[in-house]
């Protein structure tokens, strides 16, 4: 695979990483930071933050860009909501991000588990805000209603790539379905900030990127993240290019000009990386 440019190389404090990793092991929790081999793991762990990955670390889908294992998942752990709340309390988190491996094997896609976890966090950590990064729950409005009723401050569902590449890169997902879920959440509760993100480097064009921005803005999306695709292995979707930092600055300016309330656009930006900054920027909560 192509050698990474200098701006994608990261360094971090191993001791700080080990402390958070040990807490996660003790509470039998997964983080997307580790499961998805996130390049920001070191920085986030060093700041005692993490994105909790609910419902196990095995996914029922096999997106060609993703490093999470595909297979048959275990049943949900009934202790996980409380364990996540304990970890959030011990880390002193002001903003908690919850994500999951896609669980198409569950009737509600894991929505009830998300809701229980939100409630557990609110009970232990009053004042802590919560962001959910769910699957599309197969577009099921009843499942989405369960998450909406728990009222996360931010509802995130990543569109991942442009319409033209969607089926090749995410064969079990659907571009229109993702947009439909984002639209539905905003219609049901306009006070919830909606968020999505996509990657650069999969083979998209600038014109397609602009069209994607228009599509997600049209369904009321408030927050947008734009990041560099990093090919996990030779078996994954082939990297088309490394976009330069100046490209990401240009995409950010374009998105802000179109009307997004907050845009995080950088090579190492990820949907949950420094997620609290979007809330600070929109002045809704802080």
Positions of predicted regions on the chain:
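Auxiliary Fe-S-binding modules of radical SAM enzymes
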Residues: 1-51, 55, 82, 86, ...
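Short functional micro-motifs and their immediate structural scaffolds
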Residues: 43-46, 64, 68-71
């Amino acid at each position: 695979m192509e050698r990474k440019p200098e701006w994608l190389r990261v360094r971090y404090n191993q001791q700080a990483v080990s402390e958070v990793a040990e807490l996660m092991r003790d509470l039998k929790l997964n983080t997307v930071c580790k499961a998805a081999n996130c390049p920001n793991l070191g920085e986030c762990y060093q700041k005692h933050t993490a994105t909790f990955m609910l419902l196990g670390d095995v996914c029922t889908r096999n997106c060609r860009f993703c490093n999470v294992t595909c297979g048959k998942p275990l049943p949900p752990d009934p202790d996980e909501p409380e364990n996540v709340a304990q970890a959030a309390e011990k880390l002193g988190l002001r903003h908690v991000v919850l994500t999951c491996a896609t669980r198409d094997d569950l009737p509600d896609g894991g929505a009830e588990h998300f809701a229980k976890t939100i409630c557990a966090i609110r009970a232990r950590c009053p004042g802590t805000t919560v962001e959910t990064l769910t699957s599309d729950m197969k577009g099921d409005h009843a499942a989405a209603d369960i998450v909406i009723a728990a009222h996360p401050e931010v509802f995130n569902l990543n569109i991942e790539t442009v319409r033209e590449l969607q089926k090749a890169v995410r064969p079990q997902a659907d571009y229109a379905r993702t947009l439909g879920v984002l639209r539905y959440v905003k219609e049901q509760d306009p006070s919830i900030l909606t968020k999505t993100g996509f990657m650069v480097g999969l083979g998209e064009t600038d014109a397609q990127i602009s069209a994607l921005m228009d599509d997600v803005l049209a369904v009321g999306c408030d927050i947008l993240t734009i990041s560099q695709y990093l090919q996990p292995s030779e078996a994954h979707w082939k990297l088309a290019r490394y976009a330069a930092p100046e490209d990401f600055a240009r995409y950010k300016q374009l998105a802000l000009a179109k009307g997004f309330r907050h845009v995080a656009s950088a090579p190492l930006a990820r949907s949950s990386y420094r997620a609290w900054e979007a809330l600070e920027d929109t002045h809704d909560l802080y």
